């Protein structure tokens, strides 16, 4: 049975349901919109392209993303952002990191007091701000959260058993999201570490590119395991430097998201890496994908930030050297393997069993 269509807002279950907004017409936004509709909610999925919206209304399928997935009747594709924001209290923001600020800044006054939950796993290039931090800057009176985890959009849409994390210091927002999304195939856990959960989701995209390259080059299971494990160490080291809780990275939004993104051909960033491993240029790999691969943009800003704050991230530096500095894969592998080994796990005692 679908969940009750009651929404938990301001600490109370409301008897009159308001529609829920999903901002963005991509694959993940579409999957979340369908989840909400399956749970009995009326959903307004906003997108900029009128042709895309019309195709969804007529054919009940997103023509660009998630082909073959029928969009439920409870989802209405719309193009009027002002009207959508005025009608909805709970808004899931699934806009590309490069567009989020531009799209929402013009409607800042309408965001005050609303629950804004970012679904975007990216970092703004100019400021190194995460998406929830941009939302906070645009709408300081809004209630902010993030949703992140091992969540491949097509698998969610096909009802594979899936779990995710909603993170916010606002406990009532977490309850509202859990009430709206939790269903027979989708489980929602809560966390107060918004920064750690969101940073995990953004950073792992870089390592998915590396993992895709390794698979294309048939590097073997030992290599793939090493890459994923050392990626987790790098991510955690950087996140703790920035103020996150290292324990967050042992959960769904850390190691969980990293594993699925680095091991699944359905991952967009993995696909880019695989194409690179096959010999395509970066431009060719991104063009073949036809969708946004946040890891490419994240790599640039993460490399610069790691240097600025003095965090050791050899995998990030190595991938950056291949994609943007003209180094060959063989050169980078040689440098990585000759580097002095550090301790295996940070944040635990290195002095024996004390």
Curated annotation (Swiss-Prot):
Pathway connected to this protein: Membrane lipid metabolism; glycerophospholipid metabolism
UniProt: NADPH binding residues: 27-28, 48, 121, 153, 268, 292, 294
Keyword Lipid biosynthesis: yes
Cellular location(s): Cytoplasm
Keywords, alphabetical: Cytoplasm, Lipid biosynthesis, Lipid metabolism, NAD, NADP, Nucleotide-binding, Oxidoreductase, Phospholipid biosynthesis, Phospholipid metabolism
Residues the record marks as active site: 204
GO terms, biological process: carbohydrate metabolic process; glycerol-3-phosphate biosynthetic process; glycerol-3-phosphate catabolic process; glycerophospholipid biosynthetic process
GO CC entries: cytosol
Binding site for sn-glycerol 3-phosphate: 121, 149, 204, 257, 267-269
InterPro entries: 6-PGluconate_DH-like_C_sf (IPR008927), 6PGD_dom2 (IPR013328), G3P_DH_NAD-dep (IPR006168), G3P_DH_NAD-dep_C (IPR006109), G3P_DH_NAD-dep_N (IPR011128), NAD(P)-bd_dom_sf (IPR036291)
Principal location listed in the UniProt entry: cytoplasm
HAMAP family tied to this protein: NAD_Glyc3P_dehydrog (MF_00394)
PANTHER family tied to this protein: GLYCEROL-3-PHOSPHATE DEHYDROGENASE (PTHR11728), GLYCEROL-3-PHOSPHATE DEHYDROGENASE [NAD(+)] 2, CHLOROPLASTIC (PTHR11728:SF1)
Family, similarity comment: Belongs to the NAD-dependent glycerol-3-phosphate dehydrogenase family.
Record protein name field: Glycerol-3-phosphate dehydrogenase [NAD(P)+]
Organism annotation: Pseudomonas fluorescens (strain Pf0-1)
Gene: gpsA
């Amino acid at each position: 049975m679908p969940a009750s269509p009651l929404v938990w807002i301001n600490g109370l279950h409301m008897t009159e349901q308001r529609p829920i907004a999903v901002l963005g017409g991509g694959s993940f936004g579409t999957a979340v919109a369908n989840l909400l509709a399956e749970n009995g909610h009326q959903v307004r999925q906003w997108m900029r392209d009128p042709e895309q919206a019309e195709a969804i209304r007529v054919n009940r399928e997103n023509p660009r993303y998630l082909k073959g997935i029928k969009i439920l009747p409870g989802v209405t594709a719309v193009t009027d952002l002002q009207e959508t924001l005025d009608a909805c209290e709970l808004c899931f923001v699934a806009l590309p990191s490069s567009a989020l600020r531009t799209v929402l800044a013009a409607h800042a006054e309408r965001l005050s007091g609303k629950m804004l939950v970012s679904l975007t796993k990216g970092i703004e290039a100019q400021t190194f701000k995460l998406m929830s931090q941009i939302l906070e800057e645009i709408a300081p009176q809004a209630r902010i959260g993030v949703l992140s985890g091992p969540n491949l959009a097509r698998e969610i849409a096909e009802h594979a058993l899936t779990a995710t994390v909603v993170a916010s210091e606002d406990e009532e927002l977490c309850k509202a999201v859990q009430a709206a999304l939790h269903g027979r195939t989708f489980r929602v856990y809560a966390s107060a570490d918004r920064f750690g959960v969101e940073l995990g989701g953004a950073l792992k995209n870089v390592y998915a590119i590396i993992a895709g390259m390794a698979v294309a080059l048939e590097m073997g299971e030992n290599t793939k395991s090493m890459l994923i494990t050392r990626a987790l160490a790098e991510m955690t080291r950087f996140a703790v430097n920035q103020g996150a809780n290292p324990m967050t990275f042992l959960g769904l939004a850390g190691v969980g998201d990293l594993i699925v993104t680095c091991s699944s051909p359905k991952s967009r960033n993995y696909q880019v890496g695989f194409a690179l491993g096959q010999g395509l240029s970066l431009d060719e790999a991104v063009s073949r994908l036809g969708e946004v691969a946040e890891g490419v943009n994240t790599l640039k800003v993460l490399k610069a930030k790691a240097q600025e704050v003095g965090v050791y991230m050899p995998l990030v530096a190595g991938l950056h050297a291949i994609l943007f500095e003209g180094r060959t894969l063989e050169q980078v592998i040689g440098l990585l393997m000759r580097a002095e080994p550090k301790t295996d796990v940070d944040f635990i005692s290195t002095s024996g069993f004390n």
